[in-house]
Swiss-Prot record:
Family membership: Belongs to the prefoldin subunit alpha family.
Pfam short name (any one): Prefoldin
Disulfide links within the chain: none
Tissue-level expression: Expressed in larval central nervous system (CNS) and pupal testis (at protein level).
Function comment: Binds specifically to cytosolic chaperonin (c-CPN) and transfers target proteins to it. Binds to nascent polypeptide chain and promotes folding in an environment in which there are many competing pathways for nonnative proteins. Required for tubulin stability and spindle and centrosome formation in cooperation with Vhl.
Gene Ontology MF annotations: beta-tubulin binding; tubulin binding
Cellular compartment(s): Cytoplasm
Protein name listed in UniProt: Prefoldin subunit 3
Subunit structure and binding partners: Heterohexamer of two PFD-alpha type and four PFD-beta type subunits. Interacts with itself. Interacts with Vhl and betaTub56D/tubulin beta-1 chain. Interacts with tubulin alpha-beta heterodimers by itself or in complex with Vhl. Does not interact with microtubules (MTs).
GO terms classed as biological process: centrosome cycle; establishment or maintenance of neuroblast polarity; meiotic spindle assembly; microtubule-based process; mitotic spindle assembly; protein folding; tubulin complex assembly
Effect of gene knockout: Pupal lethal. Most mutants die just before emergence from the pupal case. In mutant larval CNS, neuroblasts show bipolar spindles that may lack one or both centrosomes or monopolar spindles having one or two centrosomes at the single pole. The mitotic index is elevated twofold over that in wild-type larval brains and the ratio of metaphase:anaphase two- to threefold over wild-type. Mutant neuroblasts also show a decrease of 25% in betaTub56D/tubulin beta chain-1 expression.
Keywords, sorted A to Z: Chaperone, Cytoplasm
Cited CDD domains: Prefoldin_3
Length: 194
């Protein structure tokens, strides 16, 4: 699989986008005092709640991307094995004895005659018969597409990790800002005579 992974280029990103999935970018809060002085950010708890909600959305996206990555990682070897089988069938010019799974732990021996066609599962309970050349072309196309999709997903995962980290840092900075403000308010009330 590494040979195929190296030979397939990552698809081009859409113009003015940093991700394939359209993941929104988290803005790093450079000037926390300026940010917190804006009218919509007057309450530290509400800002933390908004950031926590954004963090939760990023985590949800990360779970979805990981599930997609796992599916693609398992799909690529299956496609490669199917392609290998098409190549084996192409080379065969006489009957070949093989075993296939009849049920759990039960195999049966059979003779496979030379063939010029193969049946491929296309998904959604659809199976079609293809000549060996067309089957090979389709499988190569599917492998290339799956590898490209895998690279896109891995790129988005890297980007998403950065957004999660940025959001976590922002949450920590806002929380610390709130602690300092409460400490300053406590000091002010403690030093002012009643």
């Amino acid at each position: 699989m590494t040979g195929i992974m190296d030979s397939v280029e990552m698809p081009k990103l859409p113009e003015n986008q940093k991700t394939f999935a359209g993941i929104p970018e988290a803005v790093f809060l450079e000037e926390i005092d300026t940010f917190m002085s804006q009218p919509e950010n007057e309450n530290c708890e509400k800002v933390l709640q908004r950031l926590d909600e954004q963090h939760g959305k990023y985590r949800f996206m990360a779970c979805n991307l990981e599930a997609r990555r796992r599916k693609l990682k398992s799909q690529i070897p299956d496609l490669e094995r199917s392609l290998e089988m098409v190549n084996v069938l192409r080379k065969e010019d006489e009957e070949r004895e093989t075993q296939f799974l009849l049920s759990d732990q039960v195999f049966i021996k059979t003779l496979v005659p030379p063939t010029k066609t193969v049946y491929l599962w296309l998904g959604a309970s659809v199976m079609l018969e293809y000549p060996l050349d067309e089957a090979e072309a389709l499988l190569n196309q599917n492998i290339t597409s799956a590898v490209g999709n895998l690279k896109s997903v891995e790129h988005d995962q890297d980007f998403l990790r950065d957004q999660i980290t940025t959001t976590e840092v922002n949450m920590a900075r806002v929380y610390n800002w709130g602690v300092k403000k409460r400490q300053a308010a406590t000091k002010t009330t403690a030093t002012t005579p009643s």
